[in-house]
């Protein structure tokens, strides 16, 4: 894009960061419309993955103080069966709880990229949950029973990830189960 001005907007509280205004070139794209639900979800995801990041979109401010814990809490449709477990490491962040539903609900990310189709990192996480519960209780529970009603978020940072398509919706890297 073209830089139109290097002056600060009036009323800006802080003099750091970047302000971006985006307008579609109607000569190139004609009458273009935004899917604002999609844009808002992307903005929310960026704030969940970058603690303290503030993004203003159409006058609404988005910020997360607790990372993926906020993502899980914001997407709970009912009270969890137990307080979400939030684990962070150098290259990984995980939040897990169980709700009152019957399915499995995952939010997965690789290097800040939302991977709605999951991938090897999510598969490794699912296996690790089942294995941990089975070993802890010394019972041969069926993994699907353990994961029923799970609500979890997984974010990994890995070098040179390999995705299964150009859209980066599913991680295909097999290196050490993609960080999990």
Say what each PLM segment does:
Residues 1-77:
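GHKL-type ATPase core
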Residues 16-20, 45, 51-55, 83, ...:
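Structural beta-strand/beta-sheet cores of well-ordered domains, especially the beta-sheet scaffolds
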Residues 25, 46, 68, 78-82, ...:
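Intrinsically disordered, low-complexity regions
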Residues 32-34, 38, 46-48, 62, ...:
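Sequence-level detector for tyrosine residue identity
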Residues 50-56, 76-86, 132-145:
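Active-site phosphate-binding and catalytic loops of NTP-dependent enzymes
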Residues 60-61, 87-89:
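Long, charged, helix-rich clamp/arm modules that form nucleic acid-engaging surfaces
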Residues 71, 86-87:
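Alpha-helix C-terminal capping segments
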Residues 89-180:
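GHKL/Bergerat-fold ATPase module
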């Amino acid at each position: 894009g073209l830089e139109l001005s290097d002056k600060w907007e009036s009323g800006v509280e802080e003099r750091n960061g970047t302000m971006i205004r985006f307008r579609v070139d109607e000569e190139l794209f004609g009458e273009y419309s935004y899917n604002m639900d999609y844009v808002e979800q992307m903005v929310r995801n960026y704030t969940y993955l970058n603690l303290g990041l503030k993004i203003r979109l159409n006058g609404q401010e988005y910020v997360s103080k607790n990372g993926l814990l906020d993502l899980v809490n914001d997407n709970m449709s009912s009270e969890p069966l137990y307080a979400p477990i939030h684990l962070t490491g150098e290259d990984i962040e995980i939040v897990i709880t169980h709700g009152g539903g019957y399915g499995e609900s995952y939010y997965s990310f690789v290097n800040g990229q939302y991977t709605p189709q999951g991938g090897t990192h999510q598969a490794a996480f699912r296996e690790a949950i089942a294995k941990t519960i089975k070993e802890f209780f010394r019972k041969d529970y069926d993994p699907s029973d353990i994961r029923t009603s799970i609500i979890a978020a997984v974010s990994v940072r890995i070098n040179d990830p390999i995705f299964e398509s150009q859209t980066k919706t599913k991680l295909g890297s097999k290196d050490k189960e993609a960080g999990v």
